[in-house]
């Protein structure tokens, strides 16, 4: 098994890492408005959450360049079954200005930590939109987003946005990434298929999906 424990957060398969805030800041213009080569999904979830993602290989490369320069894959390489390199499946912005109630869910379910999510804020003021998560004992705790720091999590990490409201939308940079072996793709795709209109598979090929809230996010044991 490739699972690990964060003793500080008292939760499994989650870590916090430093990130280069100057690279993260490159995405501020995209957060402020739409641009050619991008598309959006609005899953609801007790909020006005928007996933703004690349719709072409060229715009995907913008996120991939940041992913590589930030060396995000290095933090989880030891847990992945790799042939050559850590693969970025999707990069996008998570944008919201209100959330009325928690929506606990899992990003990854029974993938044996072959896929991970990274989240980091684009600005220092997240207006209370922090990350709620469930500890191993079932208690709900809060992780406060910090500029220059990212949270990375894998399998069975139950979490939600903390309810809040902001006059100006708050944006997070998100990467979803993991193994470059196709043998794991079926379980990975079962979770993320539909979150973005385009995904890059472990083998490097691009594929189109139908935008919708990923069905894996509604796993019954997500809380």
Q: Which residues does each predicted region cover?
A:
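Non-heme Fe(II)/2-oxoglutarate
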Residues: 1-80
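Intrinsically disordered, low-complexity, compositionally biased regions/tails
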Residues: 17, 37, 41, 48, ...
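Short N-terminal helix-initiation segments at or just after the protein's N-terminus
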Residues: 53-67, 116-126, 195-200
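Short, charged low-complexity intrinsically disordered segments located at boundaries
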Residues: 59-63, 102-109, 204-206
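Short, surface-exposed loop and linker segments with low hydrophobicity and enrichment for Pro/Ser/Thr
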Residues: 61, 168-169
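Short coil/loop linkers at secondary-structure junctions
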Residues: 81-83, 218
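Catalytic core of non-heme Fe(II) oxygenases with the double-stranded beta-helix
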Residues: 84-89, 95-162, 169-172, 176-194
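Double-stranded beta-helix
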Residues: 175-216, 221
């Amino acid at each position: 098994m490739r699972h690990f424990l964060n003793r500080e957060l008292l939760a499994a398969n989650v870590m916090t890492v430093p990130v280069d805030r100057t690279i993260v800041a490159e995405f501020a213009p995209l957060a402020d408005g739409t641009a050619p080569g991008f598309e959006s999904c609005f899953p609801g979830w007790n909020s006005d959450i928007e996933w703004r993602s690349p719709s072409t290989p060229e715009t995907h490369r913008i996120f991939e360049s940041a992913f590589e320069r930030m060396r995000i894959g290095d933090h989880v390489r030891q847990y992945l079954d790799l042939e050559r390199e850590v693969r970025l499946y999707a990069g996008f912005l998570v944008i919201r200005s209100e959330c009325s109630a928690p929506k606990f869910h899992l990003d990854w379910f029974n993938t044996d930590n072959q896929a991970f999510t990274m989240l980091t804020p684009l600005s220092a003021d997240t207006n209370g939109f922090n990350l709620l998560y469930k500890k191993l004992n079932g208690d709900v705790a809060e992780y406060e987003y910090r500029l220059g720091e990212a949270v990375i999590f894998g399998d069975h990490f139950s979490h939600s946005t903390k309810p809040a409201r902001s006059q100006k939308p708050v944006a997070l940079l998100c990467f979803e990434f993991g193994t470059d072996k196709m043998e794991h793709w079926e379980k990975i795709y079962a979770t993320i298929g539909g979150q973005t209109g385009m995904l890059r598979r472990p083998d490097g090929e691009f594929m189109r999906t139908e935008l919708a809230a990923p069905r894996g996010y509604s796993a019954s044991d997500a809380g």
